[in-house]
C-alpha cells in the first residue's frame, strides 16, 4: 500500500507569518526520504495555503510522483497542463469551507468531468476523482473515463460512535470492492490519523492513502520523519493483520 503525504499545511504554517519557511519543498523531500511514495498538494482557487510557485518547485524537486488536487475549473486545468504532475485528483471546492466537505458530484457534471479527464489523459496525466463511496458516483466516474477514484473517508474519520464508524467503514469497503470490480484503481483519504487508519488500510482493494493534516500535526511533536515513518508502519502492519 502506498502513502501519499499531503504537505498543504506546511504552507499553512508558512503563510501564517508571511515568511519563506517552513518550505514545502523541504517537507516534500523529507517525506520522500522517510517513506512517502508520492507527494500530494491542493492548489485551491483562493491559494489559502499552497501557492502556484510551490507546485512548480515541488514538481521539479521530488523523485516520486506529484498528485495535484484541483477544482473543476478552466484556470486549474491550465495550471495542471503547465505543471504536468503525474496525477491530478479533481476535488469539489467551496470558498468558505475549512476543508473539503464532501465528494465530487460526478453524476451532476458528467459532461464537464469527461472533457477535463480526456484533456488531462491525452496530456499524459492520470486522473483521479475524489468521491463518496456511493455506487452511483463510482459508476459515473467509470463512465466518464477516469481510471482512478479516491474515496472520501471523512464520514468514517468523523464518526462519533463505534456503530457509526462501522457503518461508514462498511460503506467504504463495499465501495472499494465495487470500484475494483469495474477495473478502477482505488485510493482513499481525508481525516485519516494514526489512530483510525488501520481498518482502512486493511481494505485490500485500496492501493493508496493520501494523508496530510494529522501527519503535519504529529510532526509538531515527533518531527516529520518520525510522523511519516509511523504512519507507513501502521499501514504496513494493517496489511499483515488477518
Swiss-Prot record:
Single Gene Ontology BP annotation: pyridoxine biosynthetic process
The protein's annotated pathway: Cofactor biosynthesis; pyridoxine 5'-phosphate biosynthesis; pyridoxine 5'-phosphate from D-erythrose 4-phosphate: step 5/5
Predominant location category: cytoplasm
UniProt-listed Enzyme Commission number(s): 2.6.99.2
Signal peptide: none
Binding site for 1-deoxy-D-xylulose 5-phosphate: 8-9, 44, 49, 99
Broad EC category: transferase
Organism domain of life: Bacteria
Gene Ontology MF terms: pyridoxine 5'-phosphate synthase activity
Keywords (A to Z) from UniProt: Cytoplasm, Pyridoxine biosynthesis, Transferase
A Pfam family: PdxJ
Sites annotated Transition state stabilizer: 150
UniProt binding sites for 3-amino-2-oxopropyl phosphate: 6, 17, 191, 212-213
Keyword Manganese (UniProt): no
Keyword Transferase among record annotations: yes
GO cellular component, as recorded: cytosol
Job of this protein: Catalyzes the complicated ring closure reaction between the two acyclic compounds 1-deoxy-D-xylulose-5-phosphate (DXP) and 3-amino-2-oxopropyl phosphate (1-amino-acetone-3-phosphate or AAP) to form pyridoxine 5'-phosphate (PNP) and inorganic phosphate.
Similarity-based family: Belongs to the PNP synthase family.
Protein name: Pyridoxine 5'-phosphate synthase
Amino acid at each position: 500500500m502506498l502513502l501519499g503525504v499531503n504537505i498543504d499545511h506546511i504552507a499553512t504554517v508558512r503563510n501564517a507569518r508571511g515568511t519563506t519557511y517552513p518550505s514545502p519543498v523541504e517537507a516534500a523531500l523529507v517525506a520522500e526520504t522517510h517513506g512517502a511514495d508520492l507527494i500530494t498538494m491542493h492548489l485551491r482557487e483562493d491559494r489559502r495555503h499552497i501557492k502556484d510557485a510551490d507546485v512548480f518547485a515541488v514538481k521539479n524537486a521530488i523523485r516520486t510522483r506529484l498528485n495535484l488536487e484541483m477544482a473543476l475549473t478552466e484556470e486549474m486545468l491550465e495550471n495542471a497542463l503547465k505543471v504536468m504532475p503525474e496525477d491530478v485528483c479533481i476535488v469539489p471546492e467551496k470558498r468558505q469551507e475549512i476543508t473539503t466537505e464532501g465528494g465530487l458530484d460526478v453524476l451532476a457534471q458528467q459532461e464537464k468531468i469527461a472533457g477535463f479527464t480526456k484533456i488531462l489523459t491525452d496530456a499524459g496525466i492520470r486522473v483521479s476523482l475524489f468521491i463518496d463511496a456511493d455506487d452511483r458516483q463510482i459508476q459515473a466516474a467509470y463512465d466518464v473515463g477516469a481510471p482512478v477514484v479516491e474515496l472520501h473517508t471523512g464520514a468514517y474519520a468523523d464518526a462519533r460512535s463505534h456503530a457509526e464508524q462501522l457503518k461508514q467503514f462498511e460503506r467504504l469497503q463495499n465501495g472499494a470492492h465495487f470500484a475494483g470490480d469495474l477495473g478502477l484503481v482505488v485510493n482513499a483519504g481525508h481525516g485519516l490519523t494514526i489512530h483510525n487508519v488501520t481498518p482502512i488500510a486493511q481494505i485490500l482493494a485500496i492501493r493508496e492513502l493520501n494523508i496530510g493534516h494529522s501527519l503535519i500535526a504529529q510532526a509538531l511533536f515527533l518531527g516529520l520523519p518520525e510522523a511519516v515513518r509511523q504512519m507507513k508502519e501502521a499501514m504496513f502492519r494493517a496489511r499483515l493483520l488477518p
